[in-house]
Amino acid sequence: IGAPPHPDSPSQKGGTTKGPKSKDDALGTDPARERHIIAAVQDLVHNDKDVDLCKVSVPGTNLFCGDNKGIPRKEMPQLKSKPEPGGKADQMVKAGVLKLDNEGEVNTEKLFMKQIGKEAKPVRVKVTELKATQNQLVGKKVSLFLNQLQNGDPDSEFTKKLNEPIIVSRDPETGERYIVDGHHRWAALVAQDIANGGDGDIEMDIKEIDTPIEELIDQSNEFTKEMGLETKSGDKKK
């Protein structure tokens, strides 16, 4: 933040960054509203304000959080998180079974998949095909991520992390895809999709589990409790 854009970033390579100019370029039905939304999101990282993006609607779409499952952020599972002292995950770190990353977090996705006896299928989808499960999105966090996607070094570790696959539930009956973990990275890519206007659809890699979202949330919350993993709050102070 405050640094000049990287020369290889989309904003410096001629990419559209301010939203759609016409209905043909818009995600929904109101290009002017989309330009207003994206300007506000881009600005959040530079000021003292914050906005819950679940309270922001993109006309003609279910974005950002239309059809969400009404689950507060603090009640969502965190399969990548910090181990609580003395918990099972903490003990596995000390035993060398799990490794802490640079942020002091462990990735328990593989352990979770093994516990529920399911496979996570790698799929690449349009970001607009995914639905939010939680009912809170911290605007400042999405703004920070969007700033990196638009202005940061595409080959940096930060950008690579933002583009890592997220875990998604796919309902075997309806085909609906709901996000389990990775809401803020997804929302930043949605914002990028709005910002780039008619430059093409933004896609992301997902790990898809064929289980209805309610069942998968119950299973993953039980797992994170058992493992002793920190959950995250939607409180704007955090």
Label each residue range with its predicted role:
Residues G2-S22, S169-K238:
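Basic- and aromatic-enriched surface patches that contact anionic nucleotides/nucleic acids
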Residues T17-D24, T29-A32, I38-D48, C54-V56, ...:
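Short alpha-helix boundary/capping and kink motifs at helix termini
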